[in-house]
Amino acid sequence: MQKSRITHYFFILILIGAVMLLVSACSNKQKSTSSNGKVSIVASTNVYADIAKNVAGKYGDVQAVIKNSATDPHDFEPTTADAKNLTKANIIVANGLGYDSWMNKLASSVNKKTVLVGEDLMHLKKGDNPHIWYNLNMPTKYVNYLVKRLSKLQPKHAVYFKANGQKYLAKIDQIRKLAKRGNKTDKPVFVSEPVFDYALEEAGYKVGDKDFEKAVQNGTDPSPKTINKMTKEIEDKKIAFFVNNTQASSSTVKTFVKLAKKNGVPVLSVRETIPNHTTYLDWMKENYQNLANISKK
């Protein structure tokens, strides 16, 4: 969600101090499993926790720090309880790319290393689009990492982890086929912000309002020239459809959505966080199905 990126440094310093006291009371030994014999995995959000549950299966104890879809990962403030969970974790996962930087800081405070999916697995760089869960290459990279890491921690269950990983990625391939049913036009797509850009790219669409989405991402006002140009192109139906993130809006975006509907331009509604009680696979399937459907309009 495109809110101001306020970093809670003072809060983090206080939390780190409390965590260090906690760590001093805990064992510093790195175990291959938690006390219940399972591999402990802690992820920043439900996206990465849900995927991990599918790979680790009955041999994993997986938790997400952020469990509610209404919570904005950008501004989340972890607690000492969150820190305590990290001290027990064998694998710690974060999105990276500045999206959930608090997770990396929290892990460092308890002398643990976080795997940053964006940087470490997808080899993206600071400034790249952080909404990588809409990039279908992400689950492929992440699942392969989990299979390898879990197999190292529990070699006797390596075949089980590999089978789970292959089964999961086969379902991702089915979603990828949905993406290929898209784009039957050369018209560009307008977006309210870059949250869905990876999916659009997967389906072969091009974003036509880069200046607008860049301004939104940077928390600045788009220029009047940009607004006027977009307004004219929507009225003239020069775009395929308009992508609207329903979790983050503004008066300008609302005006564009209203204008698009008035002029018969389809509007594709998306969201940034996974809905509660929904799996990542179901969420992506729904999004890519909606994308395939709107291309037929």
Regions found by a protein language model. Give the residues of each.
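Extracytoplasmic metal-acquisition and chelation regions
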Residues: 2-15, 22-297
